[in-house]
Swiss-Prot record:
Name the record gives this protein: CCA-adding enzyme
Miscellaneous section: A single active site specifically recognizes both ATP and CTP and is responsible for their addition.
Binding site for ATP: 32, 35, 116, 159, 162, 165, 168
Organism expressing this protein natively: Streptococcus gordonii (strain Challis / ATCC 35105 / BCRC 15272 / CH1 / DL1 / V288)
Cofactor(s) listed in the protein's UniProt record: Mg(2+)
Length: 399
């Protein structure tokens, strides 16, 4: 098969391929960019595979950076763009289900492609638009099938994260897992416990944010692989409640997706759960805030103080979750409450602790903090204007 017209992303990278070929080596576009071009999806990163060894690649180009030279990857700077050029390679035994004990550089494209995860990612494209398909990846693309390259169990034993990538590709592409591939993913799922939490989080997060997240999540649950993810053993029945969200609902942000997951789990230990997943403190706080907002909304309407205490984007994300649950929502009320706030942070108050110590003799300590918090919420609730004269009169009355 031949592409009559190369996508612009490939056309811009053609000088890289042409220089490598002019030096006497082979070079091809490979991987996800080729797959996405055939599916007419947006192309993000253009990856190039070459028969030139790293030092040979560096001699071809004026500007390069060693970004992963031990694995054969050189970053080539060409026409104000960056391209990763990776030498054809084979990999030895994987020592920890994550990393090969040894990477060997080879001159054979076939040897390079057969170590890849799925057939749809094992396609190569030359400078003339000619596709190289050694593992029937084109057929699988046409039939919307995810099939491991070669023997499925070998691929997942090499790198167990490929199991999560399989579920993520389902969620992203709306493809079906080929039966032998799914069986191997199920059998190899215990190996996920060998993978770093951070790598699993990235794949799970991409799955949840994908347009067909239900498909990927359902396969993750029914395969039993969910049992081997951090702190999710025995969670299948609870997580299946996510399928009760509106059928066309997609998560708008990572924190919203993880909040929905935690709400389904009905856990009271949101922060502990996210520490296990090794997320940032900021991310964990935003997820916890959405969980709190949804809980508040199940009991009462939001107030001005709620709109002050929580970021408006989190309030809106929580309301979206309610809407997906078929509950009554009021987005305009959130915007109106936010617009009615006199201040949006304590930094906007016309007084601070230093002024109160100077003008009223307050000492540093809990009492000063208490009066500042009282002033802050009096302003937020609309009981006190954010005006110096009014605030000082309020303090004098309280004293």
């Amino acid at each position: 098969m031949r592409l009559e017209t190369l996508p612009s992303e490939f056309q811009e990278a053609l000088p890289v391929l042409e220089k490598i070929k002019a030096a006497g080596f082979e070079a091809y576009f490979v991987g996800g960019s080729v797959r996405d071009a055939l599916l007419q999806r947006p192309i993000h990163d253009v990856d190039i595979a070459s028969s030139s060894y790293p030092e040979e690649t560096k001699r071809i180009f004026d500007r390069t950076v060693d970004v992963g030279i031990e694995h054969g990857t050189v970053l080539v700077l060409e026409n104000n763009r960056e391209y990763e050029v990776t030498t054809f390679r084979t990999e030895d035994v994987y020592v920890d289900y994550r990393r090969p004990s040894k990477v060997s550089f080879v001159r054979s494209l076939e040897e390079d492609l057969k170590r890849r995860d799925f057939t749809i990612n094992a396609l190569a494209l030359d400078e003339n638009g000619q596709l190289i398909d050694l593992f029937q990846g084109l057929d699988d693309l046409e039939n919307r099938i995810l099939r491991a390259v070669g023997t499925p169990a070998e691929r997942f034993n090499e790198d167990a994260l490929r199991i999560m990538r399989g579920f993520r590709f389902q969620a992203t592409l709306n493809f079906d897992l080929e039966q032998d591939t799914l069986s191997a993913m199920t059998d190899c799922a215990p190996l996920l416990e060998k993978i770093s939490v951070e790598r699993i989080f990235i794949e799970f997060d991409k799955l949840l944010l994908a347009p067909f997240w239900r498909k990927g999540l359902e396969a993750l649950l029914t395969s039993g692989a969910i049992e081997f993810l951090p702190d999710l053993k025995g969670s299948r029945a609870k997580l299946e409640q996510l399928f009760e969200l509106d059928s066309d609902f997609c998560f708008s942000a990572s924190e919203q997706a993880w909040a929905a997951l935690l709400l389904a789990l009905k856990t009271q230990e949101v922060q502990r759960f996210l520490r296990i997943w090794k997320t940032s403190r900021e991310f964990a706080k935003r997820v916890a805030d959405i969980v709190e907002i949804v809980t508040i909304r199940s009991e009462r309407d939001l107030t001005k103080r709620d709109c002050y205490d929580y970021d408006i984007d989190l309030l809106l994300q929580a309301e979206e979750l309610r809407q997906a649950q078929g509950l009554a929502v009021d987005f305009s009320a959130i915007h109106n409450l936010d617009a009615s706030l006199t201040i949006h942070s304590k930094q906007e108050m016309v007084v601070n602790g230093g002024m109160l110590m100077r003008d009223f003799g307050f000492e540093p300590g809990p009492k000063l903090g208490q009066i500042l918090k009282e002033l802050e919420y009096a302003i937020v609730d609309g009981h006190l204007p954010n005006d110096l004269e009014a605030i000082y009169a309020y303090i004098k009355e309280k004293k």
